[in-house]
From Swiss-Prot:
Coiled coil: none annotated. This is Aquaporin NIP3-1. PROSITE patterns: MIP (PS00221). The chain crosses the membrane at residues 45-65, 73-93, 122-142, 167-187, 196-216, 239-259. CDD domains: MIP.
């Protein structure tokens, strides 16, 4: 909707103009009804498949190595592996697909209008396929036998309650709530420092595994539990790892949405002292200003002209923003 319409090097003026102005509701509806059959969407699905496969293979490999070779990895090591692989995949694939790797995250994003509903089934299918294939490769590579559902055979890389179902359900809810709350904070809120989103999310996974891993297995992800369950045919208490993460993710996203919602827009809260102009006014800012930025406030659908001096490197450092 918004595009850079003019960059003048002599006066270092930056103008963000609005072409073919439309309401924020119209723009949201167009963004949330993205076509299903497109090269871009196929690329996203491939990204979700690769990211989920890598995450499950690396994380579950750490579990197998720890159980097979005398526990050299330990619980903190396993937690660190999961956190690191998620962080790496976020920075590798986040710009392609959004790096969900988790059906609960995709559903929560869609419920909070941060992701198109019609793309959720495709994302979930790609995530489940990646998880299932990763579990199959793990079983083949490590020669894990069939008698794992009883927990008396070789290592089972799936998840199962080591305590009561109620306790495990609550732990999965809390862990997934924490994860989705952090994801919503660092990945969807412009007030956050987006470049550190991957680190924050990875660190949250490490912490969640440390406190919930010994109790529920710290799934936080229906695909993470479903893939191994399908390969080994272990379905006992599987519902717990589908229902609880989805409820936890929805609750985390909605709770952060309450923090985001205010009577004033985000721009009005932290960006004061700008000269307001009409949404139909094409008036340019004073050429006496060194840096000029024209933006639109989605809440009020009005234009604002903002300006500030350059920084010590001669670059525009716009500190005067919406009001």
């Amino acid at each position: 909707m918004a595009e850079i319409s003019d960059i003048t090097t002599q006066t270092q003026t930056v103008v963000l103009d609005i072409e073919n102005y439309q309401s924020i509701d119209d723009s949201r509806s167009s963004d949330l009804s993205a076509p299903l059959v497109s090269v871009s969407f196929v690329q996203k699905l491939i990204g979700e498949f690769v990211g989920t496969f890598t995450m499950i293979f690396a994380g579950c490999s750490a579990i197998v190595v720890n159980e097979t070779y005398g526990k050299p990895v330990t619980l903190p090591g396993i937690a660190l592996v999961w956190g690191l692989v998620v962080t790496v995949m976020i920075y590798s694939i986040g710009h392609v697909s959004g790096a969900h790797f988790n059906p609960a995250v995709s559903i929560a994003f869609a419920s909070s209008k941060k992701f198109p509903f019609n793309q959720v089934p495709g994302y979930i299918a790609a995530q489940l396929l990646g998880s299932t294939l990763a579990a199959a490769v793990l079983r083949l590579v490590f020669h894990l036998d069939d008698d794992v559902c009883s927990l008396k055979g070789d290592v089972y890389v799936g998840t199962y309650p080591s305590n009561s179902n109620t306790t495990s359900f609550v732990m999965e809810f809390i862990a997934t709530f924490n994860l989705m709350f952090v994801i919503s904070a660092v990945a969807t809120d412009k007030r956050a420092t987006g470049s550190f989103a991957g680190i924050a999310i990875g660190a949250t996974i490490v912490l969640d595994i440390l406190f919930s891993g010994p109790i529920s297995g710290a799934s936080m992800n229906p695909a993470r539990s479903l893939g191994p369950a399908l390969i080994w045919g272990c379905y006992k208490d599987l519902w717990l790892y589908i229902v609880s993460p989805v409820i936890g993710a929805l609750s985390g996203a909605w709770t952060y949405g309450l923090l985001r919602s205010t009577k004033k827009s985000y721009s009005e809260i932290i960006r004061p002292n700008c000269n307001k102009v009409s949404s139909r006014d094409r008036q340019e800012a004073s050429q006496d200003e060194i840096c000029v930025l024209r933006v639109v406030d989605p809440a009020n659908q009005n234009y604002f002209i903002c300006s500030s001096p350059t920084d010590i490197n001669g670059k525009c450092n716009v500190t005067c923003k919406l009001a």
